[in-house]
Regions:
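Glycine-rich, proline-tolerant flexible connector loops at the mouths of alpha/beta enzymes
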Residues: 261-277, 547, 619-626
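Active-site-adjacent beta->alpha loops and helix N-cap segments on the catalytic face
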Residues: 268-281, 332, 336, 630-633
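Catalytic cores of alpha/beta
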Residues: 303-317
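Alpha-helix-loop-beta-strand connector modules within alpha/beta enzyme cores
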Residues: 273-297, 350-355
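Flexible, glycine-rich loop/tail regions that form catalytic "lids" or insertion modules at the edges
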Residues: 23-27, 55-237, 247-251, 255-258, ...
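Conserved helix-loop functional segments at active or binding sites
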Residues: 230-233, 246-258, 264-267, 284-291, ...
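Conserved catalytic micro-motifs used in adenylation/nucleotidyl-transfer and phosphoryl/amide-
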Residues: 1-20
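Conserved, mostly hydrophobic/aromatic
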Residues: 47, 263, 313, 370, ...
Length: 638
């Protein structure tokens, strides 16, 4: 059974030596007097039916037999080194970052990165939470240079493979990683068991310096630069990648068992290879050469700084990451009193804690509970990268719409390099991905469109509303759908008398599920009234509804949502709530952040919101990623 115990496995042993196993009791009818023994598998346990010996072999016996075949215990004691036990490097051995601002520019840091991401992570030790729609451009549609990570979207699990609750099920998760030669499971021997055990995949500068200094018990590292000549453009990037892969292959064929990819040498003459591209190129090249398990992979880079960056890097093959520039930025922010009353060491510790917690949350979206299982899994989809580029560097990653290739990636890297070393800019770019800012990313909902919408509502001006809808549709091409047009037939459409009338069509419309609390009381009620007038249906979302809305208004309008949603937090779900629905909707994934559950910040839980949700006002409300009583298709059917 899986380590989480999510897949039930119950069994009977009958008096005539039959074994009946199923996910539920009663799948096969059997008289009670015929049952000699019964039981269920516990998380991580095994059951083996030996048809030759005519008996069931228990979990303990199976594992005891395997564990004693070879001296694994001795091998582990002799050949596994724990990072916490090795001699720590001196402060003088840790490289310093010269000209922090220039390096931040070269790696595409923005003011938003500092304020919205790094400060909360270093101050609070948590991955920051936001509450708004994503109306910024896809990476391929942005007019700003994009980091390569932005072209990859995380995949997630639903009913057949439920996500894990990384908070409530933390006991079954593990962030520990093993660095070095992975050995050969089909031919186990001592030579292949040397490894360095690390508590998390995020390394401090001191920890990496200690690993670099390690040259004992067959743990040796080699550092390769991930830099290219900016004067040669895309050709320079291509040549640098080819040389990198050749040197990585050479290292894997020698006695080195730790390969460190480093971009610390960035300067006026050297631009950084995008870290994700370097990692994926080396990882897949070594796989093609059947050498990947011969060597561990560490990234020493100034580029990654947020959770999605770390996840893509681990997913495409890196074992551990030293985000040296992010850590240096944390210390700089602390020195400038931007993090409150905490020490530099505590700020760095908080940042790493937030990063690791975020990695666990993303892994849990796929039902994966250990970093070692997520490592190299490539559970992403590319959006805006062409097939040739993907097939060479990101093998087997889905990419459906095409897009840029190595030349485009090189141009974006060079744009960041030029800003750092060929301009006299004195401030970081604003960013603006999380909200509209001057000279930042475009947004569908920006001052112009919001002003048009508000003016149309305040004045009841339909012409203004049409201006607003036209601006949303035509002026800001930030989504794929905004690029599409209907191909109307030449000579006009279908005669109006041959098509279904509007009144009939709208009855099949359903409003999106937005909870009361996520949107205001007025908006939630207005949507319900409008949909009921049309004969369509509105959806309550997961936040319950005030019982007063279940009764019609004096003018005949109804504020009752005919579709009632049941989410994993069960907020507002009562018998009265359920009986006033025409349709019940069990929400298995959050549309805005699938696999993560729901989260309503405490500041949005007003007294009326708390009343509808049967919760305490001002207290943050979290719906766990899975329903804790729905872990299979069978559970959902029940």
């Amino acid at each position: 059974l899986d380590r989480n115990g999510l897949r039930p496995a119950r069994y009977y042993v009958t008096t005539d030596d039959r074994v009946i196993m199923a996910s539920e009791v009663g799948v096969v009818n059997e008289n009670a007097e015929n049952i000699r023994a019964k039981g269920r598998l516990e998380p991580g346990k095994m059951l083996l039916i030996d048809t030759e010996e005519q008996r069931i072999i228990s979990d303990e016996e199976i594992k005891q037999r395997v564990a004693t075949e070879l001296p694994y215990d001795e091998w582990v004691k002799e050949h596994v080194i724990h990072l916490s036990e090795i001699t720590q490097a001196d402060e003088s051995d840790i490289p310093k970052v010269d000209d922090l601002f220039k390096k931040q520019q070269a790696f595409g840091y923005t003011q938003e990165d500092l304020v919205r991401m790094i400060v909360p992570m270093a101050k609070d030790g948590k991955d920051p939470v936001g509450a708004m729609g994503a109306d910024a451009p896809l990476a391929i549609l942005s007019d700003k240079p994009q980091l390569l990570y932005s072209y990859f979207k995380q995949m997630f699990a639903q009913v057949t493979n439920p996500p894990i609750d990384s908070i409530r099920e933390e006991m079954v998760t593990s962030t520990r990683v093993m660095l070095g030669n992975s050995g050969n499971l089909t031919d186990p021997n001592k030579a292949g068991t040397y490894a360095l055990s690390m508590r998390t995949p995020i390394l401090t500068n001191q920890e990496l310096a200690s690993i670099k200094a390690l040259d004992c018990r067959r743990m040796k590292s080699v550092t390769l630069p991930i830099l290219f000549d900016p004067t040669k453009g895309a050709d320079g990037l291509r040549d640098a990648l080819n040389e990198l892969c050749e040197k990585a292959e050479e290292a894997a064929r020698t006695e080195q068992n730790v390969l460190i990819l480093s971009d610390r040498g960035v300067d006026e003459n050297h631009a950084p290879i995008p870290a994700l591209l370097a990692v994926a190129a080396v990882h897949n090249h070594l796989i093609r050469k059947v050498l990947r398990t011969e060597i561990g992979l560490i990234l020493e880079s100034g580029e990654p700084r947020e959770v999605h960056h770390f996840c893509t890097l681990i997913g495409y093959g890196v074992t551990a990451i030293n985000p040296y520039l992010a850590l240096e930025t944390v210390r700089d922010l602390q020195a400038r009193k931007r993090l409150g009353d905490i020490t530099p060491e505590q700020a760095e510790k908080n940042y790493i804690k937030a990063a690791v917690g975020g990695i666990m949350k993303v892994m849990s979206k796929m039902g994966i509970s250990t970093v070692r299982s997520y490592h190299g899994a490539q559970i992403f989809e590319a959006l805006g990268l062409n097939t040739n580029f993907i097939n060479k560097f990101f093998v087997n990653t889905p990419t459906r719409i095409g897009g840029i290739g190595l030349v485009g990636v090189a141009n974006e890297a060079l744009a960041r390099y030029d800003r750092a070393f060929k301009s006299d800019e004195s401030v970081l770019e604003p960013g603006g991905w999380y909200g509209p800012v001057k000279d930042g990313e475009e947004h569908l909902f920006n001052p112009k469109t919001i002003d048009l919408l508000q003016e149309s509502l305040i004045n009841g001006d339909y012409a203004k509303y049409k201006e607003y809808s036209k601006a949303i549709r035509n002026d800001y091409h930030v989504t794929l759908r905004s690029l599409m047009e209907l191909n109307y037939p030449v000579g006009g459409g279908i005669p109006i008398e041959e098509v279904e009338p509007e009144e009939s069509i709208v009855k099949r419309f359903k409003a999106g599920a937005m909870s009361y609390g996520a949107i205001s009381k007025e908006a939630h009620e207005t949507i319900a009234i409008a949909m009921n007038r049309l004969g369509s249906t509105s959806n309550s979302g997961e936040g319950g509804e005030d019982v007063a809305r279940f009764k019609p208004l004096p003018n005949g309008d109804s504020m009752n949502s005919e579709v009632k949603q049941i989410a994993s937090g069960r907020f507002g779900v009562t018998a009265n709530y359920l009986i006033h629905a025409k349709e019940l909707q069990i929400k298995c994934a959050q549309g805005a952040k699938p696999g993560e559950g729901g989260q309503l910040p405490g500041k949005k839980v007003y007294p009326e919101t708390g009343k509808a949700r049967h919760s305490t006002p001002g207290v943050e409300l979290v719906s766990p990623p899975p329903h804790h009583d729905i872990y299979s298709i069978e559970d959902l059917a029940e």
